[in-house]
């Protein structure tokens, strides 16, 4: 995992940093296309298939088509579709349309026609039957008129085969994809001067015929060590004359299609930066054992095939996970090991994949339970996570946290032994409605917040606020202290004080009453 940069990208998801994430498996993608691309920032066609009625797609036309193509070349017999109206002006609702299917994008079969349809309220979902017995890769909703406005909008489209939704919102393809076919480049920052002798390229479907492998020590002066006009795609292993460089660039000058796509770029040699873990856990003055730094690791959940019971086993192998910063967001962990460009510098947030970080992640750590906790009631405390979390200790699920700013305290006495190793695993859930990327400009700051507010309590401003850009991942992670504490079997918890004043005389004396809850374990 090293920071990588691109000359352009086709969207906010397929950015250069994905060429060093260690994932060489390029999945096909569902493709969403529309007749008109004049939608405002934050109201893109992707909103139609995000599963949230709180977002929408808008075009400045009274008509226009919307097309969905299934991922990985899949085809389905869609016999029902559902449309959801948007949040405001009913005059923008579709009124007349056709619904068609195709396997090549050229020849379309009409499956349904509707006229004079009216939504009775905002964010209302209406279901329609399609007379269909054939499987198609693509489906198109062609809106021929709306209810009277010069703009058309919808919140959601869903496609069903025998009452099973075929919109797969979990597909993620780890690749960089350029915005065009003209000369394009991606380069990797190795973090320090290294000796390089080989580069391995893992191409997507859209590979370069003509390209160069270039080296640099300063990002300004580049020298080419390899050049070809006969690129073959797939996996290309290029042996090089050993050279020193801090930056390695793939410079593409000719390809087979309208884009270039690259799943992974591996650089071989000697040298390089080795991330180091933070300070080890320590005992606080109040007797709490703080698990700051130490052995924390983090990994995207899609790359972990086991469940929490197995991940929280102390012998679980997490060698391919990255070192985590705790407390901190997932994005902070990747930044601190040099795996992504610094999003606080210039417009470099556009170099970081939103889809990669807007996902579920696993955290885990191992530690030795303090001997001083022997014969005590032992507690695991998490002072703050975002967005939601499932918590596991030594192969047992101990509880969950249902939102940011909510503290979690779990009795782990049955699962740990003083003086022995223990493991904590925390599954962090992404936001249900993370919203779309907004790009600020001199003409518009974009929206303040947005649909992310439906997930409150969460970090609402992370979707974008005034001229603050959208944070990749929406600040999910373990954001506050994690520590172990010990008590006796009876504790006084949740204390609070009530002040009784003898009004109107508020000077002579005050009566204080203390209240608490007795926790008897």
Predicted ranges, named:
Residues 1, 8-14, 24-28, 38-112, ...:
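Aromatic, loop-rich ligand-recognition surfaces of beta-strand-rich domains
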Residues 55-58, 128, 174-178, 351-355, ...:
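Beta-strand-rich interaction surfaces with strong enrichment in secreted/lumenal proteins
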Residues 499-508:
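Short, solvent-exposed loop/linker segments at the N-terminal edge
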Residues 223-225, 237, 247, 282-283, ...:
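Accessory beta-strand-rich segments of carbohydrate-active enzymes
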Residues 116-122, 229-232, 401-404, 416-417:
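Short proline/glycine- and polar residue-rich coil/turn motifs
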Residues 1-41, 161-166, 262, 269-344, ...:
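Accessory carbohydrate-binding/adhesion or oligomerization-edge regions at the termini
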Residues 63-67, 80, 183-187, 198, ...:
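Intrinsic-disorder/low-complexity, polar/charged segments enriched in Ser/Thr/Lys/Arg/Asp/Glu/Gln
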Residues 510-517:
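Conserved small/polar residues in nucleotide/adenosyl-binding loops
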